[in-house]
A protein has these predicted regions:
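Accessory N-terminal region flanking or inserted into the helicase ATPase core
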Residues: 238-277, 294, 401-494
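Alpha-helical hairpin
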Residues: 25, 36, 201, 274-275, ...
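Conserved helicase motor core of SF1/SF2 NTP-dependent helicases
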Residues: 272, 276-322, 328-376, 438-441, ...
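Basic, Lys/Arg-enriched alpha-helical interface segments
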Residues: 1-82, 87-243, 429-432
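Short amphipathic alpha-helical boundary/capping segments
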Residues: 32-35, 269-274, 394-398
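A basic/glycine-biased coupling hinge at the interface between accessory DNA-binding modules
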Residues: 176, 188-192, 200-204, 209-216, ...
Length: 734
């Protein structure tokens, strides 16, 4: 079988006999490189560069080793360090698999083999443990006991689980299970036993088995992957295998010295190189219309969106056009732009514009001499406060409605739905508002909102949602005029990528629809309703002119947050209704964390002073643990963040930490994430959105654990904050 893509193209620089051999590096090889001492790292880089130039050179001494794979070889780096390489029996693909001390490298290679799955065609490093039953398999490395049954799908031995015993070889292979592991997989009886095999299984197999165990059919899993498993596979053609998305999730082809040096010098930034097969397929290829990708916290939605922007800029964007990448806050936009610059070439970045939507609207309207100043918070804006006070003075006192009611009604009904007249207000949906308003009462309430808008207009002010509506109208008018006159459209974007979609309301989605024509690859959304921290922004795409039917996907694997942190966060949302961004329902049952770590029980204290004491205790314990590791030459550099509900609480805790001799930094809209790793980060729960840290302490109010309907929003905030953590998280309530 020839190594071809769907279009018939071969891997660059390979093909006919005599062409330069193909050199690939595995995920494990790069991960090991990241751990090497500096002096050894330099030697590995020099050796790997020479290997990339010509892996068949006489100076490279391949040594036979004891391994279950007869094609694995050891290559000397210096007296003590060895590289493990797959040297093909036929073909021209040489694969760097591992690097370590002599004995450790040999031990790693002993029970491993590089094989091609005969159904999927993917390259897989298979771990052939010398065990005869699942019971002897190594257990999951967990420091605490996992609950027996837990909402969210990551439970213990008693969690309902489907058996794999009746699945055919073809089905298991199609899910990604290596042929050598079929018998062991069939004996798995619980989710915990599947976790015990996690290190032995390719990622796509682990995910597929988890979904089948949780209740999905094999056909459902394969259908969601859009994977063909009906083609003949040559299990010796590694060149063809490298073209499979499953292979590219763990192997990368090295094309030149510069590429190899870049990867080896920044091995921790593996998100730039490896994508899960599902992410890879979503990031590449043409789509016939808008795409929506859902995924819980830590599932790689933003990484996927960045890779999608790169692919579109390089493959589907004409000269003179751009891909717009937009998100909710300025901090996130700056962080994404920095990451895109490390992912994309300067030429590709010329075709990508990154801007949060508020900033985009401001620039767009200003360029068209918009006569109004946009109000982003009426309670903080002097002009808006005066306009609101005037409107409140005109309300009908006989209705017995509070000012808070009017404030929330205007936000959650009038602005959210773009209501601009009494008749539209009569027909507006008011689900979840808690107060029933008959038609006569709506007629009596409406003049207050009408008066407020008139008062704003006299002051040349506009609420942000109304400004968005004006921007949408201008875009639609400009497009219609260009079409009527036969001129080229003034729309400069070929595609729009939207991150944190759950926090964009109806007017935002309608604006995004108007930014780009209805063509292939027009809109790409990633989001998660569980992380909506602005309740007024719940919207349905289908009611904003965005049709995602047949183009909706989901990411299930959590790469960031440990199972223990995720379980604690998910428990807060048990019973909370969550939408799928299009008036449907979403759930967390099938999400799965790939890592385990320490678990800390929720702490409830009486007051802020006690909460501060507990926060300082956490930080000191973490600092002492890191110091102990560093004393043993295990250099660690782990970030810690304290996330709180208000700036007042933030200031109080920060001052105490400073008095304890800790360096601190406050993350706000103007503060970039550039502080030294040892500095404790401080942020409000809202400001922490989209960020990640090694360790997190969340300080909230005990009232967040009250009635579900009344506390749903506070629970979402705590969920978002806890899932910013990669290794450890503590929740303190006062």
């Amino acid at each position: 079988m020839s190594a071809t893509t769907n279009s018939g193209a071969r891997i660059a620089g390979t093909g006919a006999a005599g062409f330069k051999p193909v050199v690939a590096m595995s995920h494990d090889f790069l991960a090991q490189t990241a751990k090497l001492p500096m002096a050894v790292h330099a030697k590995v880089l020099k050796w790997a560069m020479a290997f990339q130039i010509d892996p068949t050179a006489p100076g490279i001494n391949y040594e036979n080793i004891q391994s279950r794979d007869p094609n694995l070889r050891s290559v000397r780096i210096d007296l003590d360090w060895r590289g493990i390489v797959h040297k093909p029996e036929r073909g021209n693909v040489y694969t760097l698999l591992y690097v370590d001390h002599h004995d450790a490298a040999y031990a790693w290679a002993k029970n491993r083999k590089l094989a091609i799955n005969r159904v999927t065609g993917a390259m897989q490093v298979v771990v052939l443990e010398t065990v005869t039953s699942v019971e002897e398999a190594p257990p999951v490395a967990a420091l605490v006991e996992v609950p027996e049954v837990f909402p969210g799908g990551q439970g213990g031995a008693n969690t309902p689980w489907a058996s794999f015993e009746g699945l055919s070889d073809q089905h298991l292979l199609a899910l990604g299970v290596p042929e050598d592991l079929l018998a062991r997989v069939r004996r798995i009886a619980t989710e915990s036993e599947l976790d015990g095999m996690q290190e032995s299984l390719p990622l796509e197999a682990y995910e597929g088995l988890f979904l089948v165990g949780a209740g999905d059919s094999v056909d459902q899993v394969l259908g969601s992957r859009e994977t063909r498993v009906d083609r003949a596979i040559d299990t010796e053609d590694f060149e063809a295998a490298l073209l499979k998305p499953e292979s590219q999730s763990r192997f990368v082809v090295v094309t030149d010295d510069a590429a190899m040096a870049a990867m080896l010098n920044a091995p921790l930034a593996q998100w730039r190189i490896f994508l899960h097969p599902t992410q890879h397929k979503l990031a590449s290829g043409s789509r016939s219309g808008p795409v929506r990708v859902l995924g819980g916290a830590g599932t790689g939605k933003t990484v996927l969106a960045m890779h999608r922007a790169k692919w579109l800029a390089e493959n589907a964007t004409a000269d003179g056009q751009k891909v717009l990448f937009t998100t909710f806050t300025k901090n996130l936009a700056r962080d994404i732009e920095d990451n895109l610059k490390s992912l994309c070439s300067p030429r590709t970045m010329e075709k990508i514009e990154v801007k949060n939507l508020d900033a985009w609207v401001y620039a767009f309207l200003r360029a068209r001499r918009y006569p109004h100043r946009i109000v982003y918070g009426r309670k903080e804006d002097a002009g808006a406060k005066a306009a609101w006070s005037t409107a409140m003075a005109a309300r009908d006192s006989s209705l017995d409605l509070t000012e808070e009611f009017y404030d929330e009604e205007f936000d959650q009904v009038v602005l959210a739905q773009g209501v601009s007249s009494r008749d539209e207000y009569r027909a507006a949906r008011r689900i979840g508002r808690g107060v029933t308003l008959a038609r006569s009462k709506r007629d009596a309430v409406w003049p207050v909102f009408d008066e407020y808008r008139q008062q704003l207009s006299t002051r040349q002010l506009k609420e942000v949602d109304d400004a968005y509506r004006d921007a949408t109208a201008l875009l639609e008018t400009e497009a219609a005029e260009a079409k009527a006159s036969g001129k080229v459209s003034t729309q400069v974007y070929s595609s729009v990528i939207v991150d944190e979609t759950q926090d964009f309301g109806t007017q935002s989605l309608r604006l995004l629809r108007a930014m780009v024509p209805c063509v292939n690859n027009d809109l790409f959304f990633v989001g998660d309703g569980h992380q909506r921290i602005y309740p007024r922004n719940r919207a349905a795409m289908s009611k904003c002119g965005i049709d995602i039917r047949g183009r909706s996907k989901k990411l299930y694997l959590n790469y960031r947050t440990t199972a223990e942190i995720r379980n604690q966060a998910v428990a807060l949302l048990e019973g909370v209704d969550v939408d799928d961004l299009d008036d449907g329902h979403d759930e967390l049952r099938r999400y799965k964390s790939l890592s385990h770590g320490p678990s800390h029980p929720m702490i409830q204290v009486d007051d802020l002073a006690a909460a501060i004491d507990e926060t300082v205790r956490y930080l000191k314990n973490w600092r002492e643990a890191d110091a102990s590791l560093n004393a043993n030459d295990c250099v660690v550099s782990r970030t810690a963040a304290v996330l709180v509900r208000s700036t007042a609480v933030r200031s109080a805790i920060e001052q105490r930490c400073k008095s304890e001799g800790m360096s601190t930094v406050v993350i706000d809209k103007d503060q970039m994430m550039t502080a030294a790793p040892e500095a404790v980060r401080f942020a409000t729960l809202h400001r922490a959105k989209g960020l990640e840290f090694d360790r997190v302490i969340v300080v909230g109010r005990r009232s967040a654990l009250g009635d579900l309907e009344e506390t749903a929003q506070e629970r979402r905030l705590l969920y978002v904050a806890l899932t910013r953590a990669k290794r450890e998280a503590g929740l303190i309530l006062f």
